Every structure is written in structure tokens, then in C-alpha cells.
Regions:
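Bacterial N-terminal signal peptides
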Residues: 12-25
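Ser/Thr/Pro/Gly-biased, low-complexity, turn-/loop-rich segments
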Residues: 2-7, 27-275, 280-287
């Protein structure tokens, strides 16, 4: 979980960024977003935005979308929806109606997503780029970048469906697990945690592999499908257990591509042009 120390350190990183980027000929972009001298890299664009925006930027809720991610995410989502359909049909044939309903709820939730509300699941904020200048991408390879307001929820994908819990200070996996139905909590041994930074961490949640873990606001948590238990042999379709393993791997990867909040300001790589035209304030997206 990221706290105030991150924000304090970011100010030092910003100063380092200005020096480091300037040393590489990248720090002076003249005028900013929408100006006649466009930023050449993502770090340049962040510096422009940082100078323009009132108040501090919450870098732990900043994001960017590479063109390669924008091309791959729609097909990943379609494949995952197909896998969920296979499992839901198998659960129905096996007479497992609760499991069928849960998987159909997951699939329906994915079907409601808009592919433009995505990010590349890695840190591309200014503090990180300042410390990793060799990984500073050219702006022409960035579809958009932006910052979200810190949300007040944690999203949970479990056999109860897809739910959002109000985030509270010191919220942990234990708190989250206690909020689930007994059957949903009992059937999962492992959870995949997707942080607001787009990182995926796996933690044990059963008695035998329990790992204490705190949750940041805006985290998404998948209680993984129980592929190691008796279900694989009970399902009527050969190879269905493979779909479970794929979902346990692919769904966290897909969740990591979601923007880290609901109220976000997004800027395109055309220096402030967006769907509504030229606007240094960017445009707002909502899930």
C-alpha cells in the first residue's frame, strides 16, 4: 500500500526528473500541452502536466496506455469471455447452479467494459520514469495517459460474483474474506491482488497458506478458481480444468489493464486534443 511517504519522495523525484530529463535534452518543451512545441516523450508530457495542474498529482493513481496494449486487450477480453462461457456451461451440465451463476456474472461484467478505459499494466508515472530514463517511451507510442481520483472501494471477484466493498484504513485480505459468503471464502486458497499501479501479487488466504496482506483503495482482488480440488474430475468436459487455470492467470492480467479508478482525467498524445477537441484539462472518463 502506498502512503504519504510515496508522495513526499515524489517531490524529490520530480526535481531529479527535471535535472535528468534536461540533461538528455528532454526537459525543455517550451510551452505545454497544446503548445506549438509538443513533448517528445511521456516524461516530457508528465512534466508539462505537472506544471499546469493545480496541486500535487497523485502519482500512485497515474497511468498510461502503450499502443501495443491497446491492440492486444480487446482480443484478450474476448478469449477470456469464451473461457468463462465454457466453464459456465460445464457447471450447468454438472448441476452446479451457484457456480454457473457466478461465472456468468463475471462474463457479463467483462461484457460491459469499454476498451478505451484501459492502461498498460506497469508503472509509467513520472517518479518511476525519472528513476528509469532508459525506459521513457516516445509519446508517439502512447495512446493516452492520465490520473484518477483515489477511489473509495476495493473490487472483489469471487464465487459471489463481482462486488465492491467500501475501503477502510488498514483493510486487509482477512477483512475482505470475512465479507464473503462461507462457500465463496471456503472454495479459494489463493487470491490475486491487482494494485492501483497495475501490479499483480498472489497471496495465500487459506488456513494452511495464509499471508497477511493490506489492500490499497482501488485494488482489485480475484479469489482464484479452485482448480486443484475435486472439481476438475467432476466436470463433464475433458480439459475444462485447463480453462480454470487460464482464467486464474488471464483474469488478473486483464484486471491490471483497467484504469485505477472511476473518475479519471485522460490526455491523448496529441497534446491536449481529445474527443471534445483542444483542452488542456484533458477529458473525464467514468467506468
Amino acid at each position: 500500500m502506498i502512503n504519504g511517504a510515496f508522495r513526499r519522495r515524489s517531490m524529490a523525484w520530480l526535481a531529479a526528473a527535471a535535472l535528468g530529463l534536461g540533461g538528455l535534452g528532454l526537459g525543455d518543451t517550451g510551452t505545454v500541452l497544446g503548445a506549438t512545441t509538443p513533448p517528445a516523450t511521456l516524461a516530457d508530457a508528465w512534466l508539462d502536466l505537472e506544471r499546469r495542474q493545480p496541486g500535487a498529482i497523485e502519482w500512485q493513481h497515474a497511468f498510461a496506455l502503450r499502443d501495443t496494449t491497446a491492440e492486444s486487450v480487446p482480443s484478450l477480453r474476448r478469449r477470456l469471455m469464451g473461457d468463462l462461457h465454457t466453464l459456465a456451461v460445464s457447471a450447468r451440465v454438472a448441476g452446479n447452479a451457484p457456480r454457473q451463476r457466478s461465472l456468468e456474472a463475471w462474463r457479463a461484467h467483462l461484457g460491459e467494459w469499454q476498451d478505451r478505459h484501459i492502461r498498460t499494466p506497469q508503472r509509467l508515472d513520472l517518479p518511476w520514469l525519472a528513476a528509469n530514463l532508459r525506459h521513457n517511451p516516445p509519446l508517439e507510442r502512447i495512446v493516452h495517459f492520465g490520473v484518477c481520483e483515489a477511489p473509495n472501494w476495493v473490487e472483489v471477484w469471487s464465487l459471489d460474483g463481482v462486488t465492491r466493498l467500501d475501503w477502510v484504513p488498514d483493510m486487509s485480505l482477512e477483512h475482505l474474506r470475512d465479507s464473503l459468503s462461507a462457500s465463496a471464502a471456503r472454495q479459494s486458497d489463493t487470491a490475486a491482488i491487482i494494485t492501483p499501479l497495475g501490479e499483480v501479487h498472489r497471496r495465500g488466504i487459506a488456513a494452511w497458506n495464509h499471508q497477511p496482506t493490506s489492500l490499497a483503495p482501488g485494488s482489485r482482488v480475484l479469489l482464484e478458481l479452485p482448480s486443484r480440488q475435486g472439481l476438475r474430475g467432476a466436470l463433464p468436459f475433458p480439459g475444462v480444468g485447463d480453462e480454470e487455470d487460464l482464467i486464474n492467470r488471464r483474469l488478473p492480467e486483464l484486471l491490471a489493464t483497467r484504469v485505477p479508478g472511476e473518475r479519471c482525467r485522460v490526455w491523448g498524445n496529441d497534446e491536449g486534443h481529445n474527443d471534445e477537441g483542444h483542452n488542456d484539462e484533458g477529458h473525464e472518463v467514468k467506468e
